[in-house]
Amino acid sequence: MSATEPNLQSWIGRSETVHDTIGATPVAALTATLDHPAMPVPIGSALPPLWHWLYFLPMHRQSDIGADGHAKRGGFLPPVPLPRRMWAGSQFEFRAPIRVGDRVARTSTIADVASKDGRTGRLVFVKVRHELRCNDAADPALVELHDIVYREAQRADDVPPPPQQAAGGAAWQRTIVPDDVLLFRYSALTFNGHRIHYDRKYVTEVEGYPGLIVHGPLIATLLLDLLRRNAPEAEVTSFRFKAVRPTFDLHPFRVNGSCDGNSVHLWAQDHEGWLTMDATATLKT
């Protein structure tokens, strides 16, 4: 870190609390986006795991949006002076249901900020802890640890990491076509302005990727949706995922799963069979 850069470590411990009410319309909209038939969403319906991402949307003023479509650096998240930002992974504990109609408070805390040098230059990792409490409860219904990675700009001589072959032996699998409409709908549902998901000229010419990038949270949601399709009565108590390499809109990709007792291995692979996301869910016994 240079003398002119902010002390990013000073952001550790900062917190904010925001409030939302769990409405039915976002649930119905994501149900349609994931290609399920329309169903009533009555008050009291439990949210499927990860669908809390439809709420607590980032309501930044248009004048506060940066060139990449995210909010300008600073504020709650530290002002990391690196241009590329990606969702690296998350861990979850699902302790109690969150239901349609609930009033929910989300307290977010900067848990850690770490910097290191990688193959492609400097990396900064920011870990955020989210706790969601329903209807003024003392204990959280959901705890999430969210890992964000910031990277330097793409260089012409960057060498991509060696790909990792995806596992075989899937008991469940589903092919996903990540077209522009799917990516747009998910961006709209989560009020995500990040241009890498919908602006092809920006993502290819400015950030140097070959195509639009499929949202990491969308892939994670599709993994747990695969579990729900094949084990609809299963109750997920914990989940973790790690983004291994980007998934682009240029080809279909596949989500896979296999169950071993109360542990479910879930993973996504690209059209060449390379692993793009690895995840594990734990089921209530």
Task: Outline where the language-model segments fall.
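A contiguous, surface-exposed recognition patch within enzymatic or periplasmic domains that forms
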Residues: 2-46, 163-219, 226-229
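Hydrophobic, proline/glycine-rich low-complexity stretches
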Residues: 1-103
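Catalytic-pocket segment enriched in acidic/His residues
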Residues: 203-262, 268-280
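Alpha-helix boundary/capping detector
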Residues: 79, 130, 134, 212-213
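HotDog/MaoC-like acyl-thioester-processing domains
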Residues: 2-15, 87-178, 247-250, 254-285
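Residue-level preference for alpha-helix termini and adjacent loops
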Residues: 10, 17, 21, 52-55, ...
